[in-house]
Regions:
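Cell-wall polysaccharide-cleaving catalytic domain and substrate-binding groove, primarily
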Residues: 2-49, 146-147, 158, 170, ...
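Flexible, low-complexity segments enriched for small/polar residues
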Residues: 3-6, 11-25, 247-248, 252-274, ...
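Short, compositionally biased low-complexity segments
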Residues: 8-16, 56-61, 76, 162-166
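N-terminal accessory alpha/beta regions
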Residues: 24-122, 127-130
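Active-site substrate-binding loop specific to GH73 endo-beta-N-acetylglucosaminidase modules
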Residues: 84, 120-317, 324
């Protein structure tokens, strides 16, 4: 029996598997069954388009650099980190491999690394992308051996007779079992011994340094043996709790912040029985009836990246000065490649506070109307009652910059099937409107379609997907 989705359910699917759907795409896919739409989403994400950059002198060994080149390398590192951020943001807004990029964004938070080492960061990002719809166990192994993770969690300093427990702790607490689940402090200490000797070469390739490894017998999670780091990861994957913990995180991210234990057990069993095949668990999730339950639609607060990409993508927005993307990410508290700590971004209601709410509500107007934003990087306006208004305005103007963008309104408007208020509201907004929002919408002029759309995207309800 062919099951069809209504427009609201299709939009829900496309927001959760990506960053929304254009009216043009909606017209095409609404003719398909639910299974056909989902199969198409997977087919479009078959390929993995790696990010690539030229790193110049950063590829040289630090010992081979002159004093002047070392200073240049420090500056280049910061520059390349900014370029990497902008490069990935552009890929998020333009890619056809939307589900793969959305899952990469999820695991970018799960395997949270905060470094100013662009070569290591782009490598880790590409490792995650390659495995995003494949096997979680393979991803975990390769991520664990990546230069970024080895640097960030100090595993290069983990040596026999002087073990460093950082990675062993986080691989259990954050990457597999979850905090305080089935492991003890002794398990962490023993596992740390197994991860000794893990390192990488100058070109970023993993290397096992035998002289640094502890070859003694270890006992981890009730198993005893002369374990290596690879053995520990296999032992962690043998625990069904690992599958459950990952499925809980996937559920919160793709379905609802409120967990349904029955759904979790269904996903956990499928994930574990498939030997951690990510496509299997996503297929089951997106094809289930409960995924489209009204209580799961329009209930999640968009992350800053989801919000920014969701505004930029349908209008094919081009930023004259892409650095504004970094500024907006910083102000909204989600800067790609700079999570707050190893636990990643807290998400959910934590995205909204007094400092972020007003900017979030103004973001559509700033982006689609080239609005003015206060650019307070290094300079503040001094509070001086004697300062002349002229001087004040001169200083203030230096702090304000236009978010200079080009939005393709023509293509967006030409693909609309209807320009009446109800149709546009259903296209732009996922949840039901509040009474206050309904009053605002009823007072808007639907004949000014461009302004009406911006006003819709400035409603609190647009913050939800």
């Amino acid at each position: 029996m062919m099951i069809s989705l209504n427009d609201k359910q299709i939009q829900h699917l496309y927001w959760r598997t990506g960053f929304g759907i254009s009216n043009h795409e909606l017209k095409i896919v609404r003719k398909l069954s639910k299974d056909q739409i989902i199969d198409q989403i997977f087919i479009e994400s078959t390929k993995a388009s790696a990010l690539s950059m030229d790193f110049g002198i950063l590829e040289k060994h630090p010992k081979d650099l002159s004093v002047a080149e070392r200073k240049q390398a420090r500056q280049l590192r910061n520059k390349k980190m900014s370029e990497l951020n902008i490069l990935w943001f552009k890929q998020l807004t333009t890619t056809k491999e939307v589900l793969r990029e959305k899952v990469t964004l999820f695991f970018h938070d799960h395997f949270a690394v905060r470094l100013r080492t662009p070569r290591a960061c782009i490598h880790l990002n590409n490792v995650i992308r390659n495995h995003a719809l494949e096997n979680f166990g393979d991803m975990l192994m390769e991520v664990s051996k990546s230069p970024a993770m080895l640097i960030f969690l100090n595993n290069r300093q983990n040596r026999k007779n002087s073990p460093n427990e950082n990675f062993a702790r986080e691989v259990m607490e954050l990457f597999t079992l979850g905090r305080d689940n089935q492991y003890t402090e002794t398990d962490i200490k023993e596992a740390a011994r197994a991860f000794t000797g893990w390192n990488f070469t100058q070109n970023g390739s993993y290397i096992f340094r035998k002289n640094h490894h502890d070859y003694g017998v270890k006992t981890v999670l009730g198993k005893t043996g002369n374990f290596t780091g690879e053995d520990i990861i296999k032992i962690l994957l043998e625990q069904k709790q690992t599958a459950r913990f990952i499925c809980q995180k996937l559920y919160r991210y793709f379905v609802n912040d409120i967990i349904n234990q029955n759904h979790i057990e269904i996903l956990t069993n499928a994930f574990y029985d498939s030997n951690y095949n990510l496509k299997t668990v996503f297929n089951l999730m997106f094809k289930s009836d409960w995924f489209y339950d009204s209580k799961n639609i329009g209930t999640k607060i968009k992350s800053p990246i989801e919000l920014m990409v969701g505004i930029s993508k349908p209008f094919k927005v081009e930023y004259e000065n892409p650095k504004v993307l970094l500024y907006l990410q910083r102000r909204l508290n989600q800067m790609l490649f700079f999570p707050p700590n190893v636990a990643g971004w807290p998400g959910g209601k934590a995205w909204i506070d007094n400092s972020t709410l007003m900017l979030r509500l103004k973001l559509a107007s700033l982006t689609l109307n080239s609005g003015v934003i206060e650019w307070q990087d290094k300079i503040d306006i001094p509070e001086n009652p004697m300062m002349s208004q002229q001087v004040y305005q001169k200083i203030k103007s230096k702090l304000q910059k236009k978010v200079k963008t080009e939005a393709d309104w023509d293509i967006f408007l030409s693909n609309l099937e209807s320009k009446n208020k109800i149709a546009l509201t259903h296209l732009i907004i996922q949840p039901e409107l509040s009474k206050a929002a309904n009053r605002v919408v009823s007072n808007l002029d639907e004949n000014d379609t461009k302004n009406f759309i911006i006003e819709l995207m400035s409603l609190p309800e647009y913050q939800l997907c």
